[in-house]
Regions:
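Hydrophobic side-chain positions on well-ordered alpha-helices
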Residues: 47, 107, 286-287
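Intrinsically disordered, low-complexity segments enriched in Gly and acidic/Ser/Thr residues
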Residues: 242-281, 287, 293-294
Length: 328
Protein backbone atom coordinates (compact mmCIF):
# COMPACT_ATOMS: atom_id res chain seq x y z
CA UNK A 1 0.00 0.00 0.00
CA UNK A 2 2.73 2.45 0.97
CA UNK A 3 4.55 1.64 -2.24
CA UNK A 4 1.51 2.62 -4.28
CA UNK A 5 1.14 5.85 -2.34
CA UNK A 6 4.74 6.96 -2.26
CA UNK A 7 6.43 5.42 -5.27
CA UNK A 8 8.65 2.39 -5.69
CA UNK A 9 7.73 -0.16 -3.09
CA UNK A 10 10.48 -1.17 -0.71
CA UNK A 11 13.09 1.00 -2.43
CA UNK A 12 15.35 2.95 -0.08
CA UNK A 13 18.03 5.54 -0.86
CA UNK A 14 21.53 4.23 -1.48
CA UNK A 15 23.70 3.92 1.62
CA UNK A 16 25.59 7.11 2.44
CA UNK A 17 29.32 6.47 2.84
CA UNK A 18 29.56 9.44 5.23
CA UNK A 19 26.61 8.52 7.45
CA UNK A 20 27.32 8.12 11.15
CA UNK A 21 26.39 4.67 12.49
CA UNK A 22 23.07 4.43 14.28
CA UNK A 23 23.66 4.12 18.06
CA UNK A 24 22.91 0.76 19.64
CA UNK A 25 20.68 0.21 22.65
CA UNK A 26 18.32 2.99 21.67
CA UNK A 27 15.71 3.95 24.25
CA UNK A 28 12.18 3.76 22.80
CA UNK A 29 13.82 2.96 19.47
CA UNK A 30 14.81 6.62 19.06
CA UNK A 31 18.12 8.48 19.05
CA UNK A 32 19.21 12.12 18.69
CA UNK A 33 20.96 12.94 15.42
CA UNK A 34 24.54 14.02 16.07
CA UNK A 35 26.50 16.33 13.74
CA UNK A 36 23.81 16.10 11.05
CA UNK A 37 24.40 12.34 11.00
CA UNK A 38 27.55 12.84 8.92
CA UNK A 39 31.16 11.85 9.67
CA UNK A 40 32.52 14.92 7.88
CA UNK A 41 30.34 17.25 9.92
CA UNK A 42 31.42 15.43 13.08
CA UNK A 43 35.06 16.14 12.18
CA UNK A 44 34.12 19.80 11.73
CA UNK A 45 32.35 19.98 15.08
CA UNK A 46 35.22 18.27 16.88
CA UNK A 47 37.75 20.69 15.37
CA UNK A 48 35.59 23.67 16.34
CA UNK A 49 35.10 22.29 19.85
CA UNK A 50 38.89 22.09 20.20
CA UNK A 51 39.33 25.65 18.91
CA UNK A 52 41.35 24.31 15.98
CA UNK A 53 40.80 26.91 13.23
CA UNK A 54 43.03 25.10 10.73
CA UNK A 55 41.10 21.91 11.40
CA UNK A 56 37.80 23.75 10.92
CA UNK A 57 38.92 25.11 7.56
CA UNK A 58 40.05 21.67 6.41
CA UNK A 59 36.79 20.06 7.53
CA UNK A 60 34.77 22.71 5.69
CA UNK A 61 36.28 21.71 2.33
CA UNK A 62 33.33 19.48 1.23
CA UNK A 63 30.75 22.15 2.12
CA UNK A 64 29.65 25.56 0.87
CA UNK A 65 29.13 27.56 4.05
CA UNK A 66 27.70 30.42 2.03
CA UNK A 67 24.70 28.23 1.20
CA UNK A 68 24.60 25.32 3.65
CA UNK A 69 22.59 26.62 6.60
CA UNK A 70 22.60 23.32 8.44
CA UNK A 71 26.39 22.98 8.50
CA UNK A 72 26.67 26.62 9.60
CA UNK A 73 24.09 25.88 12.29
CA UNK A 74 26.29 23.17 13.80
CA UNK A 75 28.99 25.80 14.38
CA UNK A 76 26.53 28.46 15.50
CA UNK A 77 25.09 26.22 18.21
CA UNK A 78 28.44 25.04 19.56
CA UNK A 79 29.30 26.57 22.92
CA UNK A 80 32.83 27.93 23.09
CA UNK A 81 33.17 28.98 19.44
CA UNK A 82 32.76 32.59 20.59
CA UNK A 83 35.96 32.24 22.65
CA UNK A 84 38.29 31.74 19.68
CA UNK A 85 36.56 32.78 16.46
CA UNK A 86 37.46 36.44 17.04
CA UNK A 87 41.15 35.62 16.64
CA UNK A 88 40.42 34.00 13.27
CA UNK A 89 38.56 37.15 12.19
CA UNK A 90 41.53 39.32 13.15
CA UNK A 91 44.41 37.13 12.00
CA UNK A 92 43.30 35.10 8.96
CA UNK A 93 42.96 37.60 6.13
CA UNK A 94 42.45 34.95 3.45
CA UNK A 95 39.55 33.25 5.22
CA UNK A 96 38.21 36.28 7.07
CA UNK A 97 34.80 36.12 5.39
CA UNK A 98 34.27 32.57 6.61
CA UNK A 99 35.37 33.51 10.13
CA UNK A 100 33.04 36.53 10.10
CA UNK A 101 30.12 34.36 9.00
CA UNK A 102 30.74 31.80 11.74
CA UNK A 103 31.21 34.53 14.34
CA UNK A 104 28.01 36.30 13.31
CA UNK A 105 25.97 33.11 13.38
CA UNK A 106 27.42 32.09 16.75
CA UNK A 107 26.73 35.49 18.32
CA UNK A 108 23.07 35.24 17.32
CA UNK A 109 22.72 31.83 18.96
CA UNK A 110 24.77 33.01 21.95
CA UNK A 111 22.55 36.07 22.23
CA UNK A 112 19.42 33.94 22.28
CA UNK A 113 20.98 31.77 24.98
CA UNK A 114 21.20 34.89 27.14
CA UNK A 115 17.66 35.99 26.33
CA UNK A 116 16.26 32.44 26.71
CA UNK A 117 13.13 31.22 24.93
CA UNK A 118 10.89 32.73 27.58
CA UNK A 119 8.15 35.23 26.80
CA UNK A 120 9.42 38.79 26.42
CA UNK A 121 7.65 39.95 29.59
CA UNK A 122 9.69 37.44 31.62
CA UNK A 123 13.11 38.45 30.25
CA UNK A 124 15.12 40.59 32.68
CA UNK A 125 16.74 43.91 31.83
CA UNK A 126 20.20 42.35 32.13
CA UNK A 127 19.23 39.52 29.80
CA UNK A 128 17.99 42.06 27.24
CA UNK A 129 21.24 44.01 27.53
CA UNK A 130 23.43 40.97 26.88
CA UNK A 131 21.09 39.79 24.12
CA UNK A 132 21.34 43.07 22.21
CA UNK A 133 25.07 43.38 22.83
CA UNK A 134 25.70 40.01 21.21
CA UNK A 135 23.28 40.67 18.35
CA UNK A 136 25.05 43.94 17.56
CA UNK A 137 28.32 42.04 17.12
CA UNK A 138 26.48 39.50 14.97
CA UNK A 139 25.06 42.25 12.78
CA UNK A 140 28.47 43.83 12.22
CA UNK A 141 30.17 40.55 11.35
CA UNK A 142 27.40 39.26 9.09
CA UNK A 143 27.21 42.49 7.12
CA UNK A 144 30.98 42.37 6.61
CA UNK A 145 30.74 38.74 5.49
CA UNK A 146 27.94 39.60 3.06
CA UNK A 147 29.99 42.45 1.64
CA UNK A 148 33.06 40.24 1.21
CA UNK A 149 31.11 37.40 -0.44
CA UNK A 150 28.20 38.96 -2.37
CA UNK A 151 26.93 35.58 -3.64
CA UNK A 152 26.45 34.05 -0.18
CA UNK A 153 22.87 33.62 1.03
CA UNK A 154 23.56 32.47 4.61
CA UNK A 155 24.63 35.90 5.96
CA UNK A 156 21.39 37.48 4.73
CA UNK A 157 19.25 34.77 6.26
CA UNK A 158 21.02 35.13 9.61
CA UNK A 159 20.58 38.90 9.37
CA UNK A 160 16.84 38.28 9.18
CA UNK A 161 17.07 36.44 12.50
CA UNK A 162 19.04 39.22 14.17
CA UNK A 163 16.63 41.82 12.76
CA UNK A 164 13.73 39.97 14.35
CA UNK A 165 15.54 39.77 17.68
CA UNK A 166 16.44 43.46 17.64
CA UNK A 167 12.97 44.52 16.43
CA UNK A 168 14.44 46.40 13.48
CA UNK A 169 12.06 48.29 11.16
CA UNK A 170 10.02 46.32 8.64
CA UNK A 171 11.79 47.97 5.70
CA UNK A 172 15.14 46.65 6.97
CA UNK A 173 13.70 43.14 7.29
CA UNK A 174 12.20 43.38 3.81
CA UNK A 175 15.51 44.54 2.30
CA UNK A 176 17.37 41.62 3.85
CA UNK A 177 14.68 39.16 2.85
CA UNK A 178 14.83 40.33 -0.76
CA UNK A 179 18.64 40.21 -0.71
CA UNK A 180 18.55 36.57 0.39
CA UNK A 181 16.01 35.57 -2.25
CA UNK A 182 17.97 37.29 -5.02
CA UNK A 183 20.75 34.86 -4.21
CA UNK A 184 18.46 31.83 -3.93
CA UNK A 185 14.69 32.22 -4.50
CA UNK A 186 14.08 28.68 -3.19
CA UNK A 187 16.18 28.98 -0.02
CA UNK A 188 14.16 27.12 2.61
CA UNK A 189 15.76 28.71 5.66
CA UNK A 190 15.02 32.21 4.38
CA UNK A 191 11.38 31.30 3.87
CA UNK A 192 11.23 29.66 7.31
CA UNK A 193 12.60 32.82 8.87
CA UNK A 194 9.91 34.80 7.07
CA UNK A 195 7.27 32.42 8.45
CA UNK A 196 8.60 33.20 11.94
CA UNK A 197 8.52 36.95 11.32
CA UNK A 198 4.88 36.75 10.24
CA UNK A 199 3.72 35.16 13.51
CA UNK A 200 1.49 37.30 15.75
CA UNK A 201 4.07 37.13 18.55
CA UNK A 202 6.50 38.92 16.24
CA UNK A 203 3.98 41.44 14.91
CA UNK A 204 2.28 39.46 12.14
CA UNK A 205 -1.40 38.82 11.61
CA UNK A 206 -3.15 35.49 12.33
CA UNK A 207 -3.09 33.28 9.24
CA UNK A 208 -0.56 35.47 7.42
CA UNK A 209 2.31 32.99 7.73
CA UNK A 210 0.23 30.07 6.48
CA UNK A 211 -0.93 32.04 3.44
CA UNK A 212 2.68 32.97 2.74
CA UNK A 213 3.81 29.33 3.03
CA UNK A 214 1.15 28.17 0.60
CA UNK A 215 2.15 30.80 -1.93
CA UNK A 216 5.84 29.90 -1.65
CA UNK A 217 5.15 26.19 -1.98
CA UNK A 218 3.34 26.62 -5.31
CA UNK A 219 6.71 27.35 -6.93
CA UNK A 220 8.58 24.41 -5.39
CA UNK A 221 10.02 21.81 -7.81
CA UNK A 222 9.25 18.15 -7.12
CA UNK A 223 11.57 16.72 -4.49
CA UNK A 224 12.63 20.15 -3.20
CA UNK A 225 12.80 20.59 0.57
CA UNK A 226 10.86 23.85 0.26
CA UNK A 227 7.76 21.81 1.09
CA UNK A 228 8.90 22.02 4.72
CA UNK A 229 7.69 25.63 4.79
CA UNK A 230 4.10 24.32 4.80
CA UNK A 231 4.81 21.93 7.68
CA UNK A 232 6.52 24.63 9.72
CA UNK A 233 3.78 27.19 9.11
CA UNK A 234 1.23 24.79 10.56
CA UNK A 235 3.48 24.02 13.54
CA UNK A 236 3.76 27.76 14.18
CA UNK A 237 -0.03 28.05 14.00
CA UNK A 238 -0.26 25.32 16.63
CA UNK A 239 2.22 27.20 18.85
CA UNK A 240 0.12 30.36 18.59
CA UNK A 241 -3.20 28.60 19.17
CA UNK A 242 -4.88 27.91 22.50
CA UNK A 243 -6.39 24.72 21.06
CA UNK A 244 -4.12 21.62 21.01
CA UNK A 245 -6.28 20.08 18.28
CA UNK A 246 -6.32 23.10 15.99
CA UNK A 247 -4.57 21.21 13.16
CA UNK A 248 -6.81 18.14 13.34
CA UNK A 249 -8.83 19.12 10.28
CA UNK A 250 -9.24 17.16 7.02
CA UNK A 251 -8.07 19.99 4.75
CA UNK A 252 -4.92 20.52 6.84
CA UNK A 253 -4.21 16.79 6.85
CA UNK A 254 -4.51 16.72 3.06
CA UNK A 255 -2.37 19.82 2.63
CA UNK A 256 0.41 18.36 4.75
CA UNK A 257 0.15 14.97 3.05
CA UNK A 258 0.38 16.56 -0.40
CA UNK A 259 3.34 18.73 0.67
CA UNK A 260 5.19 15.69 2.04
CA UNK A 261 4.61 13.71 -1.15
CA UNK A 262 5.80 16.62 -3.28
CA UNK A 263 8.96 17.20 -1.22
CA UNK A 264 10.59 14.81 1.25
CA UNK A 265 8.72 11.68 0.11
CA UNK A 266 9.31 12.36 -3.57
CA UNK A 267 11.98 10.19 -5.28
CA UNK A 268 13.83 13.34 -6.39
CA UNK A 269 14.43 14.48 -2.79
CA UNK A 270 18.16 14.54 -2.02
CA UNK A 271 19.24 13.36 1.41
CA UNK A 272 22.02 15.76 2.26
CA UNK A 273 23.61 16.01 5.74
CA UNK A 274 20.86 16.90 8.19
CA UNK A 275 17.99 15.60 6.04
CA UNK A 276 16.49 14.16 9.22
CA UNK A 277 15.43 17.65 10.31
CA UNK A 278 13.27 18.06 7.20
CA UNK A 279 11.57 14.76 8.03
CA UNK A 280 11.17 15.76 11.69
CA UNK A 281 9.34 18.93 10.65
CA UNK A 282 6.83 16.88 8.74
CA UNK A 283 6.68 14.22 11.46
CA UNK A 284 5.64 16.81 14.02
CA UNK A 285 3.19 18.65 11.76
CA UNK A 286 1.51 15.45 10.54
CA UNK A 287 1.30 14.13 14.10
CA UNK A 288 -0.28 17.33 15.43
CA UNK A 289 -2.82 17.08 12.61
CA UNK A 290 -3.57 13.43 13.49
CA UNK A 291 -2.76 12.50 9.89
CA UNK A 292 -2.60 8.72 9.42
CA UNK A 293 -1.40 8.10 5.86
CA UNK A 294 1.86 10.01 5.33
CA UNK A 295 2.89 10.16 9.00
CA UNK A 296 3.74 6.43 9.26
CA UNK A 297 5.91 6.68 6.14
CA UNK A 298 7.78 9.70 7.48
CA UNK A 299 8.50 8.03 10.82
CA UNK A 300 9.49 4.82 9.03
CA UNK A 301 12.04 6.66 6.90
CA UNK A 302 13.46 8.36 9.99
CA UNK A 303 14.05 5.02 11.69
CA UNK A 304 13.94 6.68 15.11
CA UNK A 305 16.23 9.61 14.20
CA UNK A 306 15.21 12.60 16.31
CA UNK A 307 16.23 16.26 15.90
CA UNK A 308 15.52 18.81 18.67
CA UNK A 309 14.07 21.24 16.14
CA UNK A 310 11.11 21.64 15.87
CA UNK A 311 10.13 19.36 18.78
CA UNK A 312 11.59 21.84 21.28
CA UNK A 313 8.26 23.65 21.12
CA UNK A 314 7.00 20.83 23.37
CA UNK A 315 7.79 20.53 27.06
CA UNK A 316 9.39 17.07 26.66
CA UNK A 317 10.57 17.04 23.04
CA UNK A 318 12.13 13.59 22.72
CA UNK A 319 9.35 11.90 24.67
CA UNK A 320 6.79 13.60 22.42
CA UNK A 321 8.63 12.36 19.34
CA UNK A 322 8.71 8.80 20.72
CA UNK A 323 5.02 8.92 21.62
CA UNK A 324 3.89 10.17 18.20
CA UNK A 325 6.20 7.66 16.50
CA UNK A 326 4.72 4.83 18.51
CA UNK A 327 1.17 5.76 17.52
CA UNK A 328 1.88 6.61 13.86
Amino acid sequence: MLGKLFGKAGERPEADAHALPVPRGRRNGTYPVRALGDTRVLALVEAADAGDWDGVKAALAPFDLGRDHRVLGELADLDGVQDWIGRAVEQDTEHRATALLISGARHIAWGWEARTADRAVNVTREQWRVFHERLEIAEEHLLLAAEARPHWVTPWCRLLTSARGMSLPDDVKRTRYEAALRRDPLDLETHLERVSQLQPRWGGEPGEATRYAREVFTGAPEGHRLGCVVAMAHIEDWVESDSPGCLDLPYIQKELRDAARHSILHPAYERRPGWQQDFNMFAMALSLASESVAAPQVFHELGGAYTPWPWRYMSQPEKAYARFRRHA
